[in-house]
C-alpha cells in the first residue's frame, strides 16, 4: 500500500484514472458491440505489452518469444471451453462421442490423459498462469544461471516460439493443428457468444488489466523494483553487492509470462478460438512493437501503444487493403525513430516540460503583477473639503 501511495503522490494516478475512464466509460458508450469486442481483443495484447515493460523496460531483458506465454494461457482456457462444448450429446454424430472434433477427425478413440484435468474450471484457471510461468522458470533458470543475456537471450526466446509453433501444428490430433482450438461456445453453461456476454467479458478484461497495472507498479516501487533497475543499468555492481542477479531475472521473466498468459486466456474467451498463429515469431515481434510504440518504460503507455497499433492495423487494412502493410511499417519506423522512448517518452520529455514552463511563466507574471501592486500602492482618495485644516466649507487656511 505504501508503494501505491507514493505513486499517487508522484501524480501518476491521473494517467491510470484517465485510462480507466476511457476503457470503462468512453468506449462502451461510443462503440457498438462489434467494435467494442474488437477493443476487448486489442486489450488482451496489452497484457503482453505490460509484461514487456517489466521485462524489457524495467529489467533490461528483451524477449522475442512472449507469444509463447500468450498462446499457452490461451490454449489452457481453450481446452476447458472445448471440452465443455464436446459433451457426448453435442458430439453424438462422431465416431467417438465425448471428445473434441479434431481428435475424432484424427482417429483418436479416447481423450488424452493430460486433457482430463481441464474438465475442471478451477484447474484451468490455475493452469492459465501456472503452465506459462513454469515454462518461463525452466527457460530463465537455464539461461540466466549461465549468464546468457542480451541478443543471445532474445534469439533463444525466438527459437522457443518457433519450436512451440511447429510442435502445435505437428500434433494436430492433440492440439487442433494449424487451425487451433475453435468453436468455443460456453463457460460453465454461460453462452459467451452473445453481445451481453461479450460486454461482461470486456469489463472483466479491463478490470484484470488495471489490476495487473497496479501489481506491476507495486513491484516497481518496492525494493525489488529498485534492484531490477540497478540490475538493468549496472548488473556487475549488483552482483558484487551480494545479490543473486540470475534469480531476479528469473522472477521478472516469470512475472511477465504470467501477465501475458492472462491476456491469452481472455483472448480465447472473447474471440472464441486459439491457434498457433498467435504463438510464433511474427506475433511475438508485433507484441514488442506495442511496448516500443507506447513506451517501454511506461505501463499505461504500453496499453495505449497496443490500442494504437491495432487500431491502425484495422483502419489501414479496411481503407487501404493493398497498402496497409507498408503504412503500418511506416508508422512503426516513424514513431520509433522520432520518439525513441515511445509516446510516453514524448509526453515526459517534450509535452510535460513545455507545459510546466508555461505554468512557471504564468506564475511569474502573476507574482510580478502582485509585487508591482505592493511596491506602488494606489494613492489614497482625496479628502473632503470639511476635513482640510479643520475648516468648514472647504476653505483653506489662507482664506480663513
Locations of the language-model features?
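Transmembrane alpha-helices and adjacent helix-loop boundaries
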Residues: 1-400
Amino acid at each position: 500500500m505504501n508503494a501505491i501511495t507514493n505513486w499517487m503522490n508522484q501524480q501518476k494516478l491521473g494517467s491510470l484514472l484517465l485510462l480507466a475512464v476511457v476503457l470503462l466509460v468512453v468506449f462502451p458508450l461510443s462503440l457498438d458491440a462489434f467494435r467494442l469486442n474488437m477493443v476487448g481483443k486489442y486489450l488482451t495484447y496489452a497484457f503482453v505489452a505490460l509484461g514487456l515493460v517489466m521485462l524489457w523496460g524495467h529489467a533490461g531483458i528483451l524477449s522475442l518469444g512472449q507469444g509463447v506465454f500468450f498462446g499457452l494461457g490461451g490454449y489452457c482456457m481453450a481446452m476447458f471451453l472445448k471440452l465443455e462444448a464436446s459433451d457426448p450429446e453435442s458430439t453424438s454424430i462422431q465416431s467417438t462421442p465425448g471428445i473434441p472434433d479434431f481428435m475424432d477427425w484424427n482417429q483418436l478413440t479416447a481423450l488424452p490423459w493430460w486433457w482430463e484435468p481441464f474438465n475442471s474450471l478451477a484447474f484451468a484457471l490455475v493452469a492459465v498462469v501456472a503452465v506459462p510461468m513454469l515454462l518461463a522458470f525452466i527457460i530463465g533458470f537455464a539461461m540466466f544461471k549461465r549468464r546468457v543475456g542480451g541478443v543471445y537471450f532474445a534469439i533463444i526466446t525466438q527459437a522457443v516460439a518457433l519450436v512451440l509453433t511447429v510442435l502445435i501444428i505437428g500434433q494436430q490430433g492433440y492440439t487442433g493443428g494449424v487451425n487451433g482450438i475453435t468453436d468455443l461456445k460456453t463457460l460453465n453453461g454461460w453462452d459467451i457468444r452473445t453481445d451481453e456476454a461479450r460486454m461482461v467479458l470486456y469489463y472483466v478484461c479491463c478490470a484484470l488489466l488495471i489490476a495487473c497495472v497496479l501489481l506491476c507498479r507495486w513491484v516497481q516501487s518496492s525494493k525489488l523494483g529498485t534492484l531490477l533497475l540497478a540490475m538493468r543499468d549496472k548488473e556487475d555492481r549488483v552482483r558484487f553487492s551480494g545479490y543473486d542477479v540470475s534469480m531476479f531475472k528469473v522472477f521478472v521473466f516469470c512475472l511477465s509470462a504470467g501477465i501475458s498468459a492472462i491476456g491469452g486466456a481472455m483472448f480465447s474467451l472473447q474471440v472464441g478460438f486459439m491457434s498457433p498463429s498467435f504463438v510464433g515469431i511474427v506475433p511475438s515481434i508485433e507484441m514488442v512493437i506495442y511496448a516500443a510504440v507506447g513506451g517501454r518504460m511506461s505501463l499505461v503507455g504500453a496499453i495505449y501503444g497496443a490500442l494504437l497499433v491495432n487500431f491502425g492495423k484495422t483502419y489501414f487494412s479496411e481503407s487501404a487493403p493493398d497498402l496497409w502493410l507498408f503504412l503500418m511499417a511506416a508508422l512503426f519506423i516513424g514513431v520509433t525513430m522520432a520518439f525513441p522512448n515511445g509516446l510516453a517518452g514524448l509526453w515526459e520529455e517534450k509535452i510535460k516540460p513545455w507545459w510546466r514552463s508555461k505554468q512557471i511563466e504564468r506564475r511569474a507574471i502573476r507574482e510580478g503583477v502582485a509585487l508591482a501592486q505592493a511596491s506602488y500602492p494606489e494613492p489614497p482618495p482625496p479628502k473632503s473639503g470639511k476635513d482640510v485644516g479643520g475648516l468648514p466649507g472647504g476653505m483653506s487656511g489662507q482664506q480663513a
